[in-house]
C-alpha cells in the first residue's frame, strides 16, 4: 500500500488494550485448535459409535408389538444419543411394564433406578437401565399408548462433558 508505513511493535511499552487483544486472539486460536483437533481425531470413532448405538437400539425388545417405532439419532457437541417413541395398539398396564423390565434384565441390562412421577395429573413411570457403557431410559405414561426411550453411551468423550 502506498503511503503507509508499518511500525514495529514496541514490546517494552505495550499498552494495556493491545496486550488484552493479543491475549484474546491467542486464547481464541488455542480454543479453535483444541476443538478442531478433537473433532477431527474423533470423527471415525464417533461415526462408529453412532452405528453401534443404532444397532443396540434396534436389538432392544418391546413389551408388546409396536404399531410404530419412531427414533432419531441426535447430536450434542461430540456425543450422539438416540431418542425414540414406540406406539402400541393399546395402553400398557403396570404389570406389563414391570415384566418388560424383567425381560430386559434377562438380556443383560441392570435396573439402576425406577421411579413414578405425577405431573399435571398424568402419572408416568421411568426405568433407568445400564449395560456396559450404555444407559437406557424408558418412560411410560399411564393411559397413553406410547413409551419414550433414550439411549446414550457413556464413553471417554461423554465423561469429558462434550
Model-found features: residue ranges?
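An acidic-aromatic pocket/loop used at catalytic or ligand-binding sites
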Residues: 7-162
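Short, Lys/Arg-enriched N-terminal segments with co-localized hydrophobic residues
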Residues: 1-5
Amino acid at each position: 500500500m502506498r503511503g503507509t508505513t508499518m511500525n514495529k511493535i514496541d514490546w517494552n511499552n505495550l499498552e494495556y488494550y493491545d496486550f488484552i487483544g493479543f491475549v484474546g486472539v491467542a486464547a481464541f486460536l488455542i480454543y479453535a485448535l483444541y476443538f478442531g483437533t478433537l473433532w477431527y481425531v474423533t470423527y471415525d470413532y464417533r461415526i462408529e459409535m453412532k452405528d453401534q448405538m443404532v444397532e443396540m437400539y434396534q436389538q432392544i425388545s418391546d413389551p408388546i408389538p409396536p404399531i410404530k417405532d419412531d427414533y432419531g439419532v441426535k447430536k450434542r457437541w461430540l456425543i450422539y444419543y438416540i431418542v425414540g417413541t414406540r406406539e402400541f395398539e393399546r395402553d400398557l398396564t403396570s404389570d406389563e411394564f414391570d415384566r418388560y423390565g424383567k425381560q430386559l434384565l434377562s438380556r443383560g441390562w441392570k435396573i439402576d433406578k425406577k421411579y413414578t412421577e405425577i405431573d399435571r395429573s398424568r402419572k408416568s413411570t421411568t426405568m433407568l437401565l445400564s449395560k456396559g457403557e450404555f444407559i437406557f431410559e424408558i418412560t411410560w405414561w399411564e393411559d397413553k399408548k406410547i413409551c419414550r426411550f433414550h439411549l446414550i453411551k457413556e464413553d471417554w468423550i461423554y465423561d469429558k462433558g462434550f
